[in-house]
């Protein structure tokens, strides 16, 4: 899922996997989507009026990559969507078939409320408005949200700790032209080797030459989502870079955001955020 500062995405923990992964899976049964959204997507972290804030930074990173025109195609898969949609607001103009995913049914249900425009759905309009502002295409936020809803074709379970993260059902078209993943892998991995293995697993869903847009927490060890206090594997910028290279990517861009003191609100111990744009290397024959 996505977190906020961003805690996490619960993509993936099979109770039949190793003990560390099983422990993570059990902890996530207490995850509360609305508490997570309040902690990370309502003010102060959800205040988009300050361009130096974490929210504008993440949205700007995504918009700038798509503005290059180098990331497009037919099929996009969002890995560990959590209860959030902001990570797809720039992407939806460039892909006609989008799959959202999460390990937790409660997060998939939360996404469904927004996608179906049901009463009580979380209000993402401030984020949609901000993306329209920075993209400057003359598009209204209502048009932006309509397009995203129309292009999300399915919301599926996922387990990034399995060699086939989406299973063998064939419900999502594969391989994807692009992957997005925000605050997922570090949040659902008990240690660095599991994080690297999860990245390798999701990379199998991506075509050679395809792009990964990857956002996550730097040097974070825990975060809160209601009564749940969830462990995170702390990663550094260099460890993220090394994991991408080991999974067969060329790193096109890797940048970091240092969390300012006024946004360290006690809901986690995150030190910063990373954003990576990486391209899966095509094997030469």
UniProtKB/Swiss-Prot annotation:
- Which domain of life, per UniProt? Eukaryota
Catalysis: reaction(s): phenylethanolamine + S-adenosyl-L-methionine = N-methylphenylethanolamine + S-adenosyl-L-homocysteine + H(+); (R)-noradrenaline + S-adenosyl-L-methionine = (R)-adrenaline + S-adenosyl-L-homocysteine + H(+); (R)-normetanephrine + S-adenosyl-L-methionine = (R)-metanephrine + S-adenosyl-L-homocysteine + H(+); (R)-octopamine + S-adenosyl-L-methionine = (R)-synephrine + S-adenosyl-L-homocysteine + H(+)
Its pathway, per UniProt, is:
Catecholamine biosynthesis; (R)-adrenaline biosynthesis; (R)-adrenaline from (R)-noradrenaline: step 1/1
Which Pfam families does the entry mention?
NNMT_PNMT_TEMT
Question: What does UniProt report on the pH dependence of this protein?
Answer: Optimum pH is 7.9 in phosphate buffer.
Instruction: Name the EC number(s).
Output: 2.1.1.28
Q: Does the keyword Zinc apply?
A: no
UniProt entry keywords in alphabetical sequence: Catecholamine biosynthesis, Methyltransferase, S-adenosyl-L-methionine, Transferase
Query: What regulation of activity is recorded for this protein?
Result: Inhibited by 3-methyl-l,2,3,4-tetrahydro[1]benzothieno[3,2-c]pyridine hydrochloride.
Question: What does UniProt note about where in the body, tissue by tissue, this protein is expressed?
Answer: Expressed in the adrenal medulla and brain.
- Asked whether the UniProt record includes Methyltransferase among its keywords, one would answer yes
Q: Which GO terms describe its cellular component?
A: axon; cytosol; dendrite; neuronal cell body; perikaryon; terminal bouton; varicosity
Q: Which PROSITE patterns match?
A: NNMT_PNMT_TEMT, SAM_MT_NNMT_PNMT_TEMT
What Gene3D superfamilies does this protein map onto?
A: Vaccinia Virus protein VP39
Q: Where does S-adenosyl-L-methionine bind?
A: 36, 41, 80-81, 86, 102, 107, 159-160, 182
Q: Which NCBIfam families match?
A: GntF_guanitoxin (NF041360)
Similarity section: Belongs to the class I-like SAM-binding methyltransferase superfamily. NNMT/PNMT/TEMT family.
Task: From the Swiss-Prot or TrEMBL record, give the protein name.
Answer: Phenylethanolamine N-methyltransferase
Q: What species does this protein belong to?
A: Rattus norvegicus
